[in-house]
């Protein structure tokens, strides 16, 4: 199989000292002069931009300029009007206190206090009606930038095919049905600009198209920290995902070194705007940003091939991906530093469309037939712009051409959205928020459009990216390449065998969670088992590993309810096997991701500030959750797809526990099914395969964003469907399996794994 490629296209476009005017201008527009008499703002100050062709009002922290933030000098020699959102003209600008928008609506619950507006530091609380579960933040605080902290509060009963997408504060939503193909539409109040997706469709698999919208005022900016976290979490996932598909084992983040073949598995195109509107200092700042980005990519140990070009009226190519040294990051950085702002002095317009057409040409192929493997190429375009252009036409049409070229969004069953990411950075007060939003990708739980105050903030974004100091192992990564064996596809899987004199041999499964520990079920062991009788094998290796000790959850007691007529009680059925010697990771031996760890935060593409609650909402939402377990059949490992009943089918799933052999005296399922269990099996919505006795201790896994995250440990089942090796024969509908929910035993995991550098939240 040809190696899949990742093309990362960096397009750094026109940012001026304050942007450009709100309407496209001709390249040779004559300068006019506007008087400064009467332009003052009450409570603040102003600064001139573009040589006096525009001005920006400045207010103290916690205040914003009313009714506009910027004004342009018109050809008549007068400043643009001070016009409110309601199209009214005011005589003098003033600084007003920043307030956060109020909820336009809130479904299936209530919020308090109710107020026409909310001042900085005000708090608002949300609560759901009976039968609904709260997702997001129950309490939110109005921040200094006019935005609410936390996540959108949503009350959901899990009844829809897709989860309730919610109503972000400040927006209005049209549509309350969440069936497959249903569409919801969002609107903003007059004067506010919608960022994200105005329309979202419920798709196959239960996810919404697009990204969550928000309503933005002109004075709102993203902080460098917010931008760095959101951008980096998505960018690194793209890079890591490309490595996994390429068939290479990255090893630890800071240690992995991948030497690519001559065709390259990653191409990064850096396209730098050198037009007249930028200015020398901003051009230099943009080069520093790109230098930091090159360094960041190099920190992953990959050796991509770079392309480098600048443009104004026309593009100028400086480094081609076919150059012999294009994968040498130091050499590319040297070429970047040699670029001069004067290179485009004679033709200094801003032709954004032509720059994107140059990118399109580099993505294209000669002839009618595409090259082999073209549809496995991933593309990321990063645009830094004010959203305006002064020649060439609308650049959004080229983004549409690129999507068509890459066959993205054409087939609803295979939209291929993962193969194109367009990030847009708006820089300065004169950013056209509508245009930059139109250029950016719209993806669920991701942010692709950002607005920063100035070049200093933009440089800070890339500095914070490069300043990430923690080195984390890449968990939950698999390599699905052609020559891979079962352990390439399940590199975490461990086999545990226990030999007992005069009692025979018992086998269980487990999951590698760190270099010293395997997570499994406690019932696989007996109190009198000797260390030398317990063996562990990993990575498909024939050599058994010696163990140091077995750590049981302190609340596990299989005989805990014998007096009540319950012969076996599996609550807290988890154990950690500590190995005597440190594991050496490789292509067939990697750890699985555990919830509420920093590695899983990155795997889920969440901000670095993500909470354990957000992990749970992503991995175990209130619905039927698609999951899998790995079963050993003969000498092969096979993935079995099941559904965790975590919505309206949960109660009926748990009730079937009373039909298990030995539980005849159990009157209520809650006697044996505690809140620590997850339930799979049955025939609704699909006929789930069941676990077998030898599968005990293995991981229950959620596969999300090309990563594998363990959410449970296989514990016990209602029916032994694998007796006499006749698997899945005449399986009754009440055949259920129960798994220990890892979210319920996190304190114990965190304590026992505290020295394993997993970064528990």
UniProtKB/Swiss-Prot annotation:
Q: What are the catalytic residues?
A: 523, 573, 696
**Processing and modification events after translation:** Cleaved by CFD following activation of the alternative complement system, generating Ba and Bb chains. Cleavage and activation takes place when CFB is already associated with complement C3b.
Q: Which InterPro entries match?
A: Compl_C2_B, Complement_B, Peptidase_S1_PA, Peptidase_S1A, Sushi/SCR/CCP_sf, Sushi_SCR_CCP_dom, Trypsin_dom, TRYPSIN_HIS
Q: Which residue numbers delimit the Peptidase S1 domain?
A: 474-754
Keyword hit for Metal-binding: yes
One annotated Gene Ontology cellular component of this protein: extracellular region
Give me any GO biological process, just one: proteolysis
Residues the entry annotates as binding Mg(2+): 275, 277, 350
Q: Where is this chain's protein located in or outside the cell?
A: Secreted
Among SMART domains, the record links this protein to: CCP (SM00032), Tryp_SPc (SM00020), VWA (SM00327)
Task: Note the SS bond partners.
Answer: 34-73, 59-95, 100-142, 128-155, 162-202, 188-215, 475-593, 508-524, 596-612, 653-679, 692-722
The site feature described as Cleavage is recorded at 256-257
Residues bearing attached sugar chains per UniProt: 119, 139, 282, 375
Molecular function terms from GO:
serine-type endopeptidase activity
Signal peptide positions (record): 1-22
One protein family per Pfam: Sushi
Can you give the residue ranges of the Sushi domain?
A: 32-97, 98-157, 160-217
| Keywords assigned | Cleavage on pair of basic residues, Complement alternate pathway, Disulfide bond, Glycoprotein, Hydrolase, Immunity, Innate immunity, Magnesium, Metal-binding, Protease, Repeat, Secreted, Serine protease, Signal, Sushi, Zymogen
Subunit note? Monomer. Interacts with complement C3b; this interaction is dependent on the presence of Mg(2+).
Main function:
Precursor of the catalytic component of the C3 and C5 convertase complexes of the alternative pathway of the complement system, a cascade of proteins that leads to phagocytosis and breakdown of pathogens and signaling that strengthens the adaptive immune system. The alternative complement pathway acts as an amplification loop that enhances other complement pathways (classical, lectin and GZMK) by promoting formation of additional C3 and C5 convertases. CFB is cleaved and activated by CFD to generate Ba and Bb chains; Bb chain constituting the catalytic component of the C3 and C5 convertases.
Annotated family: Belongs to the peptidase S1 family.
UniProt note: domains: The unliganded VWA domain has an inactive 'locked' conformation whereby the scissile Arg-256|Lys-257 bond is protected from proteolytic activation.
Q: State the name under which the record lists this protein.
A: Complement factor B
The taxonomic lineage of its organism, from the top, reads:
Eukaryota, Metazoa, Chordata, Craniata, Vertebrata
Primary gene name: Cfb
């Amino acid at each position: 199989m040809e190696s899949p490629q990742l093309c990362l296209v960096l397009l750094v476009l026109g940012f001026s000292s304050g942007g450009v005017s709100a309407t496209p201008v001709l390249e040779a527009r004559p300068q006019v002069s506007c008087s400064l008499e009467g332009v003052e703002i009450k409570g603040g100050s102003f600064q001139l931009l573009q040589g006096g062709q525009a001005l920006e009002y400045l207010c103290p922290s916690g205040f914003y300029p009313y009714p506009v933030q910027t004004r342009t000098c018109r050809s008549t020699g007068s400043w643009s009007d001070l016009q409110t959102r309601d199209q009214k003209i005011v005589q003098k600008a003033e600084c007003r206190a920043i307030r956060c928008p109020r909820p336009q609506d809130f479904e299936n619950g209530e919020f308090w206090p109710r107020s026409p507006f909310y001042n900085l530091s005000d708090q608002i609380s949300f609560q759901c009606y009976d039968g609904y579960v709260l997702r997001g933040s129950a309490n939110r605080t109005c921040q200094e930038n006019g935005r609410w902290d936390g996540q959108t509060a949503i009350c959901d009963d899990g009844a829809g095919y897709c989860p309730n997408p919610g109503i972000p504060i400040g927006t209005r939503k049209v549509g309350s049905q969440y069936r497959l193909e249903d569409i919801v539409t969002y609107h903003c109040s007059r004067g506010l600009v919608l960022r994200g997706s105005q329309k979202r469709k419920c798709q196959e698999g239960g996810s919404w198209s697009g990204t969550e919208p928000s309503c933005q005022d002109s004075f709102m900016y993203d902080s460098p920290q917010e931008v760095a976290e959101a951008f980096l979490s998505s960018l690194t996932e793209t890079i890591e995902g490309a490595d996994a598909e390429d068939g290479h084992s990255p090893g630890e983040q800071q240690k992995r070194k991948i030497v690519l073949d001559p065709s390259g598995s990653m191409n990064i195109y850096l396209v730098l705007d050198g037009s007249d509107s930028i200015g020398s200092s901003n051009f230099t700042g943009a080069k520093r940003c790109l230098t930091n980005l090159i360094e960041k990519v190099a920190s992953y140990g990959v050796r991509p091939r770079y392309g480098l070009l600048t443009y104004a009226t026309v593009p100028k190519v400086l480094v081609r991906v076919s150059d012999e040294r294009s994968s040498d990051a130091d050499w590319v950085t040297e070429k970047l530093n040699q670029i001069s702002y004067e290179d485009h002095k004679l033709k200094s317009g801003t032709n954004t469309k032509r720059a994107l057409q140059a990118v399109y040409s580099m993505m294209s192929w000669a002839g009618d037939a595409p090259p082999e493997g073209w549809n496995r190429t991933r593309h990321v375009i990063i645009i830094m712009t004010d959203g305006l252009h002064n020649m060439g036409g609308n650049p959004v049409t080229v983004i549409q051409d690129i999507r068509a070229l890459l066959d993205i969004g054409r087939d609803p069953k295979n939209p291929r959205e993962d193969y194109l990411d367009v990030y847009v950075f708006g820089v300065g007060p004169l950013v056209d928020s509508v245009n930059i939003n139109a250029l950016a990708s719209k993806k669920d739980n991701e942010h692709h459009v950002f607005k920063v105050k100035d070049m200093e903030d933009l440089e800070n974004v890339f500095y914070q990216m490069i300043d990430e100091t923690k080195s984390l192992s890449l968990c939950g990564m698999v390599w699905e390449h052609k020559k891979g064996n079962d352990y390439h596809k399940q590199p975490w899987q461990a086999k545990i065998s226990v030999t007992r004199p005069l009692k025979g041999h018992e086998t269980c499964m487990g999951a590698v969670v760190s270099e010293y520990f395997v997570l499994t079920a406690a019932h696989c062991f007996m109190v009198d088992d000797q260390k030398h009788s317990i063996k562990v094998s990993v990575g498909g290796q024939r050599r058994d590993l010696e163990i140091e000790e077995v750590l049981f959850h302190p609340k596990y007691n299989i005989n805990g309810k014998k007096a009540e007529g319950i012969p076996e009680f599996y609550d807290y059925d988890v154990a950690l096997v500590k190995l005597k010697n440190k594991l050496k990771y490789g292509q067939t031996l990697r750890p699985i991701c555990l919830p509420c760890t920093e590695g899983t935060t990155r795997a889920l593409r969440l901000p670095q500030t993500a909470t354990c609650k957000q992990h749970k909402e992503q991995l175990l939402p209130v619905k039927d959750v698609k999951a899998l377990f790995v079963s050993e059949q003969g000498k092969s490992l096979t993935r079995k797809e099941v559904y965790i009943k975590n919505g309206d089918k949960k109660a009926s799933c748990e009730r079937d526990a009373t039909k298990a052999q030995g539980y005849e005296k159990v009157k209520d399922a809650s006697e044996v099914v505690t809140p620590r269990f997850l339930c799979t099996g049955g025939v609704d919505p699909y006929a789930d395969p069941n676990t077998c006795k030898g599968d005990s201790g293995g991981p229950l896994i959620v596969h999300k964003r090309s990563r594998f995250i363990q959410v449970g440990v296989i514990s016990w089942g209602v029916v032994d469907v694998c007796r006499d090796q006749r698997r899945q024969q005449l399986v009754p509908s009440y055949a259920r399996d129960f798994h220990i929910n890892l979210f319920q035993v996190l304190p114990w995991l965190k304590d026992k794994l505290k020295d394993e550098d997993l970064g528990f939240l």
